């Protein structure tokens, strides 16, 4: 059936999709083994392939595929993901991830996209609250002489401070080294809220003190500007051309901690 689709399709990868579509509606009891199915396909096709593989499995087939495409990874089904790693002497290991709780599955499905799923393919990750930190940390890496992409480091925007504990759990289950950067949101001019103190304590407990970099009281405070209006743009302008000696110390510390974690893992390219 797939061979017939290959003969009619304009390109091999389009043929792969057409052939699998036909199989998903008619075939059961078959083992499919596919290497790097994402090659030469647009990101939209990656997401569609993931759903197509699910349809095949629901008909009683088994689907095995290798991938370096975050769009093909489903963090809502961690128990279906097997991580293949290689140590410094070339020994390969395969580890199946433990599933996450049902309540968290829904949250992960909502919060993760292909970019966030890159953390599964990373040597290390920096977990940050939002867009401001995500767009400015690469400038800190650059000013210190590093490129996070070259180092295979993912800067993961967690969609808010309250989601950071969930991302910590995902990193731990995937055995991805990580560093957390978050605001304390505790200001001397006002009484600290119990909720903020509890969240800060939860993050510190889950991540560990050595993996946690707290910005006092927030990003604006350590970067030297005030106000929330257009914060990402202002932060970008503030740090885009900063020299090493002008960088905020907490951000430098976060970058150096992440680099140290990343360099403990074997890179997939050099």
Per-range role (PLM):
Residues 1-115:
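Switch/communication elements of ASCE P-loop NTPase nucleotide-binding domains
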Residues 73, 82-270:
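Acidic, divalent-metal-binding catalytic cores of TOPRIM
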């Amino acid at each position: 059936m797939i061979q017939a689709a290959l003969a009619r399709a304009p390109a091999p990868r389009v043929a792969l999709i057409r052939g699998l579509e036909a199989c998903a509606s008619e075939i059961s009891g078959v083992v499919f083994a596919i290497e790097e199915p994402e090659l030469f396909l647009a990101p939209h096709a990656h997401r569609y392939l993931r759903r197509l593989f699910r349809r095949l499995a629901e008909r009683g087939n088994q689907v095995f595929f290798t991938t370096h495409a975050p769009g093909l990874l489903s963090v809502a089904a961690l128990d279906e993901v097997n991580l293949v790693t290689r140590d410094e002497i070339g020994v390969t290991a395969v580890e199946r991830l433990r599933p996450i709780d049902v309540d968290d599955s829904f949250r992960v499905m909502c919060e993760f996209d292909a970019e966030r799923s890159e953390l599964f393919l990373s040597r290390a990750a920096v977990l940050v609250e939002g867009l401001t930190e995500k767009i400015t940390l690469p400038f800190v890496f650059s000013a210190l002489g590093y490129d996070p992409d070259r180092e295979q480091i993912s800067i993961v925007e967690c969609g808010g401070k309250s989601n950071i504990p969930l991302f910590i759990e995902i990193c731990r289950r995937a055995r991805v080294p990580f560093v957390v950067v978050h605001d304390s949101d505790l200001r001397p001019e006002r009484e600290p809220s119990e909720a903020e103190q509890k969240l800060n304590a939860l993050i510190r407990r889950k991540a560990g003190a050595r993996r946690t970099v707290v910005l006092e009281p927030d990003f604006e405070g350590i970067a030297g500007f005030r106000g929330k209006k257009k914060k990402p743009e202002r932060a970008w302008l503030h740090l885009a051309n900063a020299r090493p000696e002008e960088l905020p110390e907490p951000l430098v510390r976060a970058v150096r901690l992440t680099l140290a974690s990343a360099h403990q893992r074997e890179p997939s390219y050099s």
